[in-house]
């Protein structure tokens, strides 16, 4: 019997079969998938084959994982040599960010977009909590919108508190499997509650001391918006370490740098200190946003110092 993973709790998985029946399932024995070094062999969105337990008809044993079309992955916070799958087989990612309470760093945004670019997953950036914006924060939003939208990342301004912007976001969720990601406290669970009011998911709490969110969604879970649309809620990501993306291909995942491939003096240019670098010329001419280049250099330096 075939099914799709709707929730992963570590050792048990909630699987929806093709006939709409849900099963609590386990993975048979030790399982390696495509030699991918991950802490979680199965992820929400995975298509699987399973056998129903004849003694317990509500349970099943997973014996095969279908090939994945794509996935979003981050470096494991506990085992840095391993990755941790966030979601698989998705059509688009919705990144919720906030400029206040808590503030999402530009570096985090860029790292997430790199993870999406690695598998050509379209990304939408949702700037939430606009009801907290003053004039300076609105200017910051407009600047970031001017940076990201020309690169192909749609930007939407929302306030879950005031229900502003949902009319622009909701149509984008139709006929797709969408994964919602971001820091704790940015409003992911609140968004899911707006989309699925019958769920009444516990919402994020902001610590007065740290101004950072506390985890409320413990495990990723997928919900049916309708017969052709699904939304995946994910736990808050504190830090997003890139996994299996080497320095020599990092620029490929920056659209503004990818368009300049082959134009540098040296074919193996890292776009940092080399002479005749076309990318640096564009940065100096403000044709590439300085914040994007800073993110690129930060990742390059981080990887070089941890070799």
Curated annotation (Swiss-Prot):
Q: Which GO terms describe its biological process?
A: ribosomal small subunit biogenesis
Instruction: Indicate yes or no for the key word Metal-binding.
Output: yes
Record bears the keyword rRNA-binding:
yes
Write down how the cofactor binds this protein: Binds 1 zinc ion per subunit.
Its function, per the record, reads: One of several proteins that assist in the late maturation steps of the functional core of the 30S ribosomal subunit. Helps release RbfA from mature subunits. May play a role in the assembly of ribosomal proteins into the subunit. Circularly permuted GTPase that catalyzes slow GTP hydrolysis, GTPase activity is stimulated by the 30S ribosomal subunit.
Which UniProt keywords are present, listed alphabetically? Cytoplasm, GTP-binding, Hydrolase, Metal-binding, Nucleotide-binding, Ribosome biogenesis, RNA-binding, rRNA-binding, Zinc
Molecular function per GO: GTP binding; GTPase activity; metal ion binding; rRNA binding
Report which gene this protein is encoded by: rsgA
Cell location: Cytoplasm
Q: What is this protein called?
A: Small ribosomal subunit biogenesis GTPase RsgA
According to its UniProt entry, this protein's organism is Cytophaga hutchinsonii (strain ATCC 33406 / DSM 1761 / CIP 103989 / NBRC 15051 / NCIMB 9469 / D465)
Family note: Belongs to the TRAFAC class YlqF/YawG GTPase family. RsgA subfamily.
| Assembly information from the UniProt record | Monomer. Associates with 30S ribosomal subunit, binds 16S rRNA.
Q: Which residues bind Zn(2+)?
A: 264, 269, 271, 277
Question: Which Gene3D superfamilies does the UniProt record give?
Answer: Nucleic acid-binding proteins, P-loop containing nucleotide triphosphate hydrolases, Probable gtpase engc, domain 3
Q: Which EC number(s) does the record attach to this protein?
A: 3.6.1.-
